[in-house]
A protein has these predicted regions:
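ACP-dependent fatty acid/polyketide chain-elongation machinery
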Residues: 1-64, 86
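Residues that mark the start of a beta-strand
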Residues: 3, 97-99
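Glycine-rich beta-strand-to-loop/alpha-helix junction loops that act as flexible
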Residues: 7-9, 102-105
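Acyl-thioester C-C bond-transforming condensing/cleaving domain
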Residues: 17, 28-32, 36, 84-96, ...
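Generic hydrophobic secondary-structure packing signal
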Residues: 21, 25, 71-78, 137, ...
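A glycine- and small-residue-enriched flexible loop/hinge segment at structural boundaries
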Residues: 38-88, 102, 137-151
């Protein structure tokens, strides 16, 4: 069996905007869960989430940004870090033997709701041509392939919270099968109330720790009462 190794990492998350920051936060046991006032105003049971302190509009060229929802923009920044970490040249990135498999747990619900509201208030012609690459379930891989001129395999896997793990595993198998020499793999999610409300309605998210959000994430604790939604890309 062909041995596969990880040569570069890139992360944008609630505990850091790059690998170094995330590593430090993990060593310090830092929580990225915070109170979200909007969720309280909307009447959500769960009023906490993993938020980001990052202005993607300042970091992504607007010509690329117009095609991206926030999740795809996070992915773009994480991939930029991974490329630098791996020391890949432009020709190695944009190469027939280089591919990308990266996804998200669902579509960009905020963009879908926005398009619906625009259609209702102003008509369908006002929706604009950039909403599809922002909203579709394959927005992450599509935007990465376009921005970095990926010439090899490019697609998304969507499998809820397992999306990133499945994408990474699929990338490993792709290289083992000889279909590619290099693969970018991972997953990303943006945070928007239009998606959060679905999980809140299910009662799947933590609501006991709204006043102490840093204590909400307790995956293996007997007192856990649900997960915390968040935005990130790895």
């Amino acid at each position: 069996m062909k041995r596969i190794v990880v040569t570069g990492l890139g992360v944008v998350s609630s505990i850091g905007n790059n690998v170094a920051e995330v590593t430090q936060s993990l060593k310090q046991g830092k929580s990225g869960i915070e109170a979200v006032p909007q969720y309280k105003e909307l009447g959500f049971r769960s009023q906490v989430a993993g938020t980001l302190k990052l202005n993607v509009d300042e970091l992504v060229d607007r010509r690329l940004r117009r095609f991206m929802g926030d999740g795809a923009a996070y992915a773009y920044l994480a991939m930029k870090e991974a490329i630098a970490d791996a020391g890949l040249s432009d020709t190695e990135v944009s190469n027939d033997r280089t591919g990308v498999v990266a996804g998200s747990g669902g579509p960009t619900t905020g963009a879908i709701v926005q398009a619906a509201l625009i259609t209702k208030e102003k008509g369908p012609k006002k929706v604009g041509p950039f909403m599809v690459p922002r909203a579709m379930s394959s927005t992450v891989s599509a935007n990465l392939a376009t921005a970095y001129k990926i010439k090899g395999l490019s697609y998304s896997i969507s499998s809820a919270c397992s999306t990133s793990a499945h994408c990474i595993g699929n990338a490993v198998e792709t290289i083992q099968l000889g279909k590619a020499d290099r693969m970018f793999a991972g997953g990303g999610e943006e945070l928007d109330w239009t998606l959060s409300v679905l999980f809140d309605a299910m009662g799947a998210m933590s609501s006991k720790y709204n006043d102490t959000p840093q204590k909400a994430s307790r995956a293996y604790d007997k007192d856990r009462d649900g997960f915390e939604i968040g935005r990130a890309h790895v």
